[in-house]
From Swiss-Prot:
GO terms for molecular function: nuclear import signal receptor activity; small GTPase binding. This is Importin-11. Disulfide bonds: none annotated. It comes from Homo sapiens (Human). The modification Phosphoserine is found at residue 343.
Length: 975
């Protein structure tokens, strides 16, 4: 590409690519895509985005194309890689001038320089760091800032490399430039502190921006640049200096008010200081040991004393609390139970912690957390009134403790209470003691204090197990509080029902459950929505609990289910609907079939909710989960849901529909339970199997469920299903077997085995293309035992239950192997006998014995030659299945199922599904469960004797080991 002529053309196309008109935009994008691999294209882009007279949008696009080009074509091994000559020119051009006037473009240029640095620095680009260091010293404000911005992005990128050689290079870089980085940061920080007193906002903002960038560089160097940072005086000097700098910056917040343009940058800088400490503690806990005392003193004074008044802000308090939490909970600082087994570093850190966390300090922290930070704020109470659903969602967990004040204070309380429970338990018990009896509804402060203390008692439930008689407290104090219906008492009604939910799995006598259910029924009718939602949560925890008893719950089931359904209709937010649906699902799951009389309203409502939730895939997932439990609870009656259920399954499992990304896993589970509980096949249920072929092509983690679904169809209606879908299914299986794991192969073959078991005549015909693959695997002695076992299971079914098909298969394989049929059969029997030990399932072992015995009687010399092996397998099978009757002393086949008896289902067991019943009926037709192996052997040997005559038969029996013959005779006594 000639630069001069090309620049004009590329500039024109880039201009077209910024157009809003797709007719202009699309051809331009196509042209740029073609140029991506042209030599010289990136040099042209560099010329364009460094030309400040051109349109900003065009320059922005040029930078983006350059950045993408680095990702795709900068590496030497990449297809269409840039030449070394062009890369040298580009590297030089990128760091010639740091004078980009537009902030967004400057950031993108800094990022792309960092991307090149990741690949080329320092080996191919040794001049980058020295150039940056010189450039950040210049007096020109713009150049200095842009160089500093680039310096930060380069440092950040190099710090993120993880290979050992790259880490070593970064360590070398860090030790070489750390002093300079420190002095640079100190210079900009001092400048900023001087500017603050001047009141010049522009100058303050400019110097603060440089302070922030230089601190970002130092953070990466400090945290990632040293193996043993505590041995480096500059590093430890910088870290110790942070506390003084933090005080200075916090004091600045008095003069830089919340409405000042610099306020946001100031708070970001203060937070960045705390991030340096948190990151360093996380990466180098033992190097942090000299900083433990100072960190705790600093954080506790600003968060729990008047020192912080007027200067702290929420995010800073959260960071300080996280610092305390990380020191308290740090496993590196916890000695072993046997102190002698702990390292000196651990003991040193532990000693510092213990010296700091004295009884007065812990007591004050605990009291301040509860009486100050746990109190519901004005903002929260306003939100409760104006947006009750938003208020309940605000309280969600996850990682919110890292960023939000309330979750952060609660997690800190839990960790400190756990670590120092012997000290803090009496403190909390004393706070509880002072709050006995009802609270005056007119005294809002007293109500909020009680709410905060109850919150603490709930959070510390496990630690207070031995110290609180919760059952008595529930009866005498908590239950009466739930009955106070005054509107101003609602924070306590909500808190008490939440508190019970926290204790339910810790300590709550089973006999008290009915009293709790009564209270829940009342609270689900509370006037306040927040109270109702919290009550639903506690109901879920109660129903989920290990000691839940259905018989205690059933008297309240109708009322609770009706009230939960009303709550589901009343709430409007997606998250709240999901939450209430999960509670409903949980109830349905626990009571199972007992739910049937009460689900009519929910069944009518779910289609409407499904339609309304078209844009909310997570809510649809919750609906799918509810449907799964509904189908399981309804059993065969779930057939009445098909007009709604089957289209839902169809959409959720259709990989051509975008929602499948969210819905597929739950959709497959719903499909499976629908099949398992279906009393009979319907055309619509059969039709949705069209979704299966693309699912099998995905080869995802959902394959196992897909195989279960296919089995479900085979058990439900094998003939109709196989005639409709077996050809396509067989093709999918053949493709899968080429590329799937060993475990996956076994799953595929188990489906085939099931088809042969359910339909011995049609099955082998439909899966005919797979059977040569199985036969070949047996003959060649498949090395994985679990695969070989499955091969023999499949072949055993064909040999035993479809002899004519086996003969045609043997004939086909003889042609393929270019062998005589008899010779091939002999090889197969020999391999079967040799690998019998691969089969571990008793059913398959009996099947093998029956299958090989089915070859008798025979005058075929090959079969007679293998007679000894067949008898060996048969006797092994007898050992597997025969049990001795202690009364008569005779043997009987324990696998025989003579009649269909419905097993009694205990309360804890799930009733049998329709599929379970189908499997039972199938077993009653399966030779493995209907043919006595003992009888079968006797009849086959008798027939062989009649065919050969006494003398010929005796000669045959003499080929069998005498010990085996003795065992056989013992099993056949009485015949």
């Amino acid at each position: 590409m000639d630069l001069n002529s090309a620049s004009t053309v590329v500039l024109q196309v880039l201009t077209q690519a910024t157009s809003q008109d797709t007719a202009v935009l699309k051809p331009a994008e196509e042209q740029l895509k073609q140029w991506e691999t042209q030599p010289g294209f990136y040099s042209v882009l560099l010329n364009i985005f460094t030309n400040h007279t051109l349109d900003i949008n065009v320059r922005w696009l040029a930078v983006l194309y350059f950045k993408h080009g680095i990702d795709r074509y900068w590496r030497r091994v990449a297809p269409h890689a840039l030449s070394e000559e062009e890369k040298t020119t580009l590297r030089a051009g990128l760091i010639t001038n740091f004078n980009e006037p537009i902030n967004q473009i400057a950031t993108q240029i800094a990022v792309l320089i960092a991307k090149v640095a990741r690949l080329d620095c320092p080996r191919q680009w040794p001049e980058l760091i020295p150039t940056l260091i010189e450039s950040v010293k210049v007096q020109d404000d713009l150049r200095q800032h842009r160089a500093l911005l680039t310096f930060y992005h380069v440092t950040k990128t190099l710090a993120s490399k993880r290979l050992a050689a790259d880490r070593k290079l970064f360590y070398d870089l860090a030790s070489g430039i750390y002093n300079f980085a420190c002095s640079l940061w100190n210079h900009h920080t001092d400048t900023f502190l001087q500017e603050v007193s001047s009141g010049n906002e522009a100058a303050i903002l400019s110097s603060l921006e440089r302070t922030l960038l230089s601190l970002k560089v130092l953070r990466k160097l400090t945290v990632n640049g040293f193996v043993e940072p505590h041995k480096n005086m500059e590093v430890m000097g910088f870290l110790h200096g942070i506390f003084e700098r933090l005080k200075q910056f916090l004091e600045c917040s008095r003069s830089i008010g919340t409405d000042n343009v610099c306020r946001d940058r100031l708070e970001k800088t203060i937070i960045l200081f705390t991030k340096v400490l948190l990151d360093f503690l996380d990466q180098h806990p033992f190097s942090f040991t000299p900083l433990i005392q100072r960190s705790l003193e600093f954080s506790v004074s600003y968060v729990f004393t008047e020192v912080g008044e007027g200067v702290t802000f929420e995010r800073f308090i959260v960071q300080c609390m996280n610092l305390i939490k990380m020191i308290v909970k740090n496993y590196a600082y916890k000695p072993s139970k046997n102190f002698e087994d702990s390292s000196p570093e651990t003991l040193e850190a532990h000693k510092i912690k213990m010296a700091f966390f004295t009884y007065p300090t812990l007591t004050e922290i605990c009291r301040r957390l509860v009486s100050h930070y746990f109190l519901l704020t004005e903002e929260e109470l306003t939100m409760w009134e104006e947006d009750p659903e938003g208020f309940t969602v605000e309280e969600t967990g996850g990682d919110s403790w890292k960023y939000s004040l309330r979750p952060c204070t609660e997690v800190l309380f839990i960790d400190i209470f756990h670590e120092y429970n012997q000290t803090l338990t009496p403190v909390l018990l004393e706070m509880m003691q002072t709050l006995q009896g009802p609270t005056n509804v007119e005294d809002m402060n007293a109500l909020l204090i009680k709410d905060a203390v109850y919150n603490a008692v709930g959070l510390a439930a496990y630690e207070l197990f031995d110290s609180v008689d919760f059952d008595q407290w529930f009866k005498n104090q908590l239950l009466p509080e739930l009955q106070v219906i005054h509107n101003r008492y609602k924070p306590l009604r909500r808190r008490v029902i939440w508190l019970i939910g926290q204790w339910i799995s810790v300590k709550f006598k089973s006999d008290l459950r009915p009293m709790l259910y009564e209270a829940i029924c009342n609270l689900l009718q509370d006037q306040d929505l927040v109270v109702r939602i919290e009550t639903a949560t506690t109901l879920k925890l109660t129903v989920d609990d290990f000691e839940f008893r259905t018989d205690q719950f059933l008297p309240y089931l109708e009322t609770m289910f009706t009230l939960l359904f009303q709550l589901l209709q009343q709430v409007t937010e997606c998250d709240t609907k999901m939450h209430v649906l999960h509670v409903l699902s949980c109830v349905i799951e626990r009571v199972n079939m007992q739910i049937r009389p009460y689900v009519g309203c929910l069944v009518q409502y779910l289609p409407l909710l499904w339609k309304q939730s078209e844009e909310h895939n997570m809510l649809r997932c919750a609906i799918l989960t509810t449907l799964i439990h509904l189908v399981q609870g309804l059993g065969a009656d779930s057939k009445n849901l098909y007009p709604f259920l089957l289209p839902v399954i169809q959409l959720s499992t259709d990989v051509s529909q975008p929602p499948h990304v969210y819905l597929l896993e739950d959709g497959l589970e719903l499909w499976l339970v629908t099949l398992e509980n279906s009393p009979c096949i319907t055309p619509e249920l059969l039709r949705i199997f069209q979704n299966m072929s693309p699912l099998l092509e995905l080869s995802s983690e959902n394959l196992r469920t897909c195989f279960k679904i296919i089995n479900g169809y085979i058990f439900l209606s094998s003939t109709e299903f196989l005639q409709t879908y077996a050809v396509g299914l067989c093709q999918s299986f053949c493709e899968l077997l080429k590329e799937i794991t060993t475990e996956g192969q076994v799953q595929v073959l188990k489906v085939v085995e099931n088809a042969l078991k359910v339909n011995p005549i049609l099955g082998p015909q439909m899966f005919q293309p797979i059977l040569p693959y199985v036969f070949k695997g047996i003959i060649e002695g498949e090395r994985y035992p679990v695969v070989m076992s499955t091969y023999l299971g499949v072949m055993g079914r064909v040999l035993l239950q479809n002899t004519s098909f086996f003969s045609s298969l043997l004939n086909e394989m003889a042609h393929k192997f270019n062998q005589e049929m008899d010779q091939l059969l002999g090889n197969m029997i020999e391999m079967w006998v040799d690998r019998m030990d691969n089969i571990t399932q008793p059913e398959r072992r009996k099947l093998s014995a029956l299958a090989l015995l089915s070859l008798l009687p025979s005058d075929n010399s090959v079969i007679q030659d293998k007679f000894c092996g067949i008898i060996n397998i048969s006797v092994e099978g007898l050992h597997d299945v025969m049990t001795e009757d202690p009364e008569t002393g005779t043997y009987k086949d324990c696998m025989l199922m003579s009649h269909l008896e419905e097993p009694k289902v205990t309360e804890d067991e799930e009733p049998p599904t329709e599929q379970d019943k189908r499997k039972k009926m199938l077993a009653l037709k399966d030779p493995v469960h209907t043919v006595s192996l003992q009888q079968f052997i006797y009849e086959k040997l008798k027939a062989q004797q009649e065919m050969l005559g006494e003398q010929g038969f005796q000669s045959l029996m003499e080929t069998v080991d005498t010990e085996i013959v003795t065992q056989l005779q013992e099993f056949l006594q009485g015949f």
